[in-house]
Amino acid sequence: MKDSVIRKLEGLLERNEEVLALLSDPGVISDQERFRALSKEYSQLEDVVTSFKSFQQATEDLEAAKEMASDDDPELKEMAQEEMKEAKSLLEKLEDELQILLLPKDPNDDNNCFIEIRAGAGGDEAAIFAGDLFRMYSKYVESKRWQLEVMNTNEGEHGGFKEVIAKVSGEGVYGQLKFESGGHRVQRVPETESQGRVHTSACTVVVLPEIPESEAIEINKGDLKVDTFRASGAGGQHVNKTDSAIRLTHIPSGIVVECQDQRSQHKNRAQAMSVLTARIQAVEDEKRRSAEESTRRNLVGSGDRSERIRTYNFPQGRVSEHRINLTLYRLNEVMEGELDAILEPLMLENQADMLAALSEE
């Protein structure tokens, strides 16, 4: 391992000890905000520190085995050779592990997120497919024991959704789901198709991190246009009696957010503000990313909603993930929420891409 990397790891080990000492300081314990921030930092350092301590121990074991190998006793020499082999193998494994742990982390990976699904080309069939995608994500969320809360729906005339927005809450949800952003295409025979012809339609998926209030960008109230209207769709008689639905328009960017799934106007407004903040932040982040990444390739794509990332071919039972040339003949399982077969290879490819970029620097 490079000396510069060793020095960086030694610095992290030192910082870990500092943070641990601070967490037992009465002055820090009484300051909830600082205690929370240090606890988060300690948690983030834990994996890399544990791996580096194992790396240091394996390095010591290798040196001890080398010393033993210089002994005249043939039995000791043989034992030393075996120990050297084991230590070298462990060091290689730990070096790979540490390289990945040292990769720059997306600060939003641990955040909750919003999933927005919109029907695109394909009319009624696109709306039905948007409903299928929403069900797929709901099943995946359930399998992870996360929480899903529907924030806004615009139902299709023959089923599914023209648009659906949901919030997913849980540990590391944005980091798991962020690669779902982009164009999703379906190829299948619609139920209304009498000739048995395969139709192609599409949906866009946008995954945005929820921005904590303490980190949220400040939105000038003068830049907001607020409209109230009566909620449509399910909800009983109540929806016809009060203007509980909210539409927020951010005038400088033109971003519009509607929320109507809560019965109270106050709750709908709070949720709409959360989504609006996330969208504005995403625009700012994309500007920054474009500037930073203009010189390097990103294998898993930019998450641009216009980029076609995946095709679901029902006649062949096939899912094709175009960004990493992955083809699975497990369409039914994927549509039932078994997404790890796609998400895990995407995350590994992203790590490989980042490692390649670091080695070029």
UniProtKB/Swiss-Prot annotation:
Modification after translation (UniProt): Methylated by PrmC. Methylation increases the termination efficiency of RF1.
Database matches in InterPro entries: PCRF (IPR005139), Pep_chain_release_fac_I (IPR000352), Pep_chain_release_fac_I_sf (IPR045853), Prokaryotic/Mito_RF (IPR050057), RF-1 (IPR004373)
UniProt cross-references to Pfam families, sorted A to Z: PCRF, RF-1
Biased composition (Basic and acidic residues): 285-296
NCBIfam families reported for this sequence: prfA, PRK00591.1
Main localisation: cytoplasm
Residue numbers of N5-methylglutamine PTMs: 237
One GO MF term attached to the UniProt entry: translation release factor activity, codon specific
Keywords: Cytoplasm, Methylation, Protein biosynthesis
Primary role: Peptide chain release factor 1 directs the termination of translation in response to the peptide chain termination codons UAG and UAA.
Stated family: Belongs to the prokaryotic/mitochondrial release factor family.
Name used for this protein in its record: Peptide chain release factor 1
Subcellular locations according to the entry: Cytoplasm
Disulfide bridges in this chain: none
GO CC annotation, single: cytoplasm
Residue segments, region Disordered: 285-305
